[in-house]
Regions:
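Nucleotide-activated chemistry modules centered on ATP-dependent adenylation/adenylyltransferase
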Residues: 1-233
């Protein structure tokens, strides 16, 4: 299962015994890669990018990984979207016009500087979007960029492949909303109504954390609740 992904990982293992993994905490791709990398490398530093820090719905996944894999550690940094949100006052957060915006590439370099680790792994798949498909197909094995030292082992796989691996290996199930079958963006989708309803039902303290930082999010729920009381036309 995921044999091509393992071959990609094995190639990098010949070059280093420690890697960075950009880990979304509750996402299926991250759960799969964390399991695979922990078995191949001496040290795996997972970088979790948050939009709201301290959400239990995400922290529980990080605790799971640290407990299950002794060679896995986590560092948390603001998500690149957080800098943009802060700069422009998205969803009512306190605007910080002087805030510098960061790209994922820049955050990767910051993580490298803090850890001293060069090779970075990501859960990107060609099936995610056209842009990712075009990008990934330019790399060796459609997965390895030796120039930037970035690796995408799941490039050729689909969501169902990751879910099958999770089931077969009896890993923790990724976060899924109650209103749909899609897995969410692990604490990033703060304006997604399904995600907000999921938090209200399962992790109300996390919802409070989001509203404290992005107060206009509460209006989305207010409008939803109001519409639920209106007669169907």
């Amino acid at each position: 299962m995921l044999e091509e992904a393992q071959k990609v990982i094995d190639k990098i293992r010949e070059l280093t015994d420690e890697v960075i993994l950009f880990h979304s905490a509750s996402g299926k791709d991250s759960i799969v890669l964390c399991d695979m990398l922990s078995k191949s490398f001496r040290k795996v530093v997972c970088v979790y990018m948050y939009v709201v820090k301290g959400m239990e719905s995400q922290e529980m996944y990080m605790r799971y990984a640290k407990t299950k894999y002794p060679n896995v550690t986590f560092m948390q940094v603001p998500h690149y979207a957080w800098y943009s949100y802060a700069k422009y006052g998205y969803m009512g957060c306190v605007p910080r016009p002087q805030m510098k915006k960061y790209t994922l590439a820049e955050l990767t370099d910051i993580a490298r500087g803090k850890t001293g680790i060069e090779w970075a792994f990501f859960g990107f798949k060609q099936s995610d979007s056209l842009n990712r498909r075009v990008m990934l197909r330019t790399y060796e094995d459609e997965a390895i960029n030796y120039k930037t030292k970035k690796v995408y082992p799941l490039s050729k796989y689909k969501n169902r492949d990751c879910m099958e691996y999770i089931k077969k290996m009896s890993l923790i199930h990724p976060e899924t909303t109650e209103n749909c079958n899609k897995t969410q963006s692990s604490g990033v989708a703060i304006s997604d109504l399904d995600y907000l309803l999921f938090l209200r039902s399962r992790f109300p303290q996390d919802l409070k954390l989001i509203i404290n930082e992005y107060p206009l999010v509460e209006r989305l729920l207010y409008e939803y609740d109001f519409n639920q009381t209106q007669p169907t036309k």
